[in-house]
Amino acid sequence: MDSNTVTSFQDILQRMSKMQLESSSVDLNGMITQFERLKIYRDSLGESVMRMGDLHSLQSRNATWREELSQKFEEIRWLIAECRNILTKTENSFEQITFLQALQLLLEVESEIRTFSFQLI
């Protein structure tokens, strides 16, 4: 995994955990949890591409893998929509910077997951 991506995830998660949004902390905690799960999924998918044995095992459970991949893309789209929603509402520059960076990171991760998945298909 790219060390910049690791740093970006850690930085954004740390900053989000310190925020209090007007909507609710439950929404923010849900976003943080989904970011963490997305990072783990992206890491495991990248590692699967690197190991040919895992490639064979993924192909053998192809239908399940495709469903899981589809679900992750839905989660990414939801997170992107939430980041955009927060950006339209907030006037706090710290929150704006954090969620702009989160949005950029989500787009990068979506692209990486697409690349990995094409390599596995």
UniProtKB/Swiss-Prot annotation:
Keywords: Host nucleus, Host-virus interaction, Transport, Virion
GO cellular component, one term: host cell nucleus
UniProt signal peptide: none
Subcellular locations according to the entry: Virion; Host nucleus
Additional record remark: Average number present in a viral particle is estimated to be 130-200 molecules.
Function, in words: Mediates the nuclear export of encapsidated genomic RNAs (ribonucleoproteins, RNPs). Acts as an adapter between viral RNPs complexes and the nuclear export machinery of the cell. Possesses no intrinsic RNA-binding activity, but includes a C-terminal M1-binding domain. This domain is believed to allow recognition of RNPs bound to the protein M1.
Protein name: Nuclear export protein
Organism placement in taxonomy: Viruses, Riboviria, Orthornavirae, Negarnaviricota, Polyploviricotina
Gene: NS
